[in-house]
Amino acid sequence: MKNKELSVLVLICIINSLGFGIIVPLLYSYGKRFGINHETIGLLTAAFSIAQFFATPVLGSMSDRFGRKPLLAISLFGTCLSFLMFAFAQGVIMLFAARILDGLTGGNVSVAQAMISDTSTSKDRAKKFGILSSAFGFGFVIGPAVGGLLSKISPQMPFYFAAVIALIGALCSVFFLKETRIKEENTSLVQAKRFSFSSLITTLKMPVVGTAIFIGFLLTMAQFTMIIGFQTFSVDNLKLNNANIGLLYTGFAATGIVMQLCVPFFTRIISSKAMILLLSTAACFVAMFYTGFTGVVITFSVGMVIYGLFNGIRNPMLNAIIADNNTSNRQGEVMGVNQSYASIGQTLGPITAGLVTMFSIHGVFFLSAFYILIAFLLTFRLTSKCKS
């Protein structure tokens, strides 16, 4: 992928993540107007992830057959419509319908990852995945602050703005993004590349890829468990308003970008991607365990910053490991399966977090630390597999 083409993809990813960054920190406070509480915010978050679980591997496989560009555009148009549904919502049912629609068309991340896999080599893959992850992260940095400010105009304004942003991203993908799948490959693989849900199982049996996907599932579950704790702890314990929540979330996301941009530096010092993942996962565990003991804004922020820093390395390393150990004609499908299992983590994390908040909000952070600990132990296995 040439620098110009990569720049276009990065711009689209920034635009896409900006919309999500605007609304995600506001879901709980906005949903409370319709009766959303500690338990149901987990279900609302999970609705998106369940729909995405079924959709992303199919969309990824379709991108292998028909090309990345049309599937990316469809995903972004679906996101635009879902944000509009949120803005016009009159009750809880519409909120859930909007999240489900966004999940069903939520193949943008896996398709973008497949585009990087198409056009990179093992040598520069981690670097390009780091750039892509930082692009998504950059939108999350700006988004919460923008959403917090727009919410002062009206509760619906952040969702209108996010819809416009998603529409711009879709139009950019249609008019400015070049296809990365070779036409001859698409034509010859239309019949051979039909997706089967058995891939959700067979992919896990791939020696390195399966372990990496499961580690990603655990770390995603930990992150989305933390997000529920972040939202409820910020509102109910720290008593922060929407603007301050947005700024705090912005700081958390910014730390991840710093590390993602440093991926080339880390890969020069440590050649093993699995070893980098191992060390960063250990740091995430320590940070999350510490956060469970915090009670004021300053100490809570310290824990989030440390976690955000080292969690930022996760996706570039895991995605590079998966792409390195995958065949070129299955990049979209396998990245879709990877995103599908991440969706399970996005589902189970909020649900278990919602149950734990019934007893202790601090317990959510300890639960997240437990998931990270399991992932850390599995990363030892991944490291040995990569060496062999």
Give the location of each predicted region.
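Short amphipathic helix-loop junctions that connect adjacent transmembrane helices
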Residues: 25-39, 228-244
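Helix-breaking motifs and short loop linkers at transmembrane-helix boundaries and internal kinks
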Residues: 35, 67, 88-93, 293-295
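Residue-level signature of mid-helix packing/kink "hotspots" within the transmembrane helices
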Residues: 49-57, 107, 140-141, 253-261, ...
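Helix-to-loop junctions at the C-terminal end of transmembrane segments
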Residues: 56-67, 259-272, 357
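Cytoplasmic helix-loop-helix junction between adjacent transmembrane helices
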Residues: 98-138
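Helix-loop-helix hairpin linking two adjacent transmembrane segments in secondary transporters
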Residues: 131-175
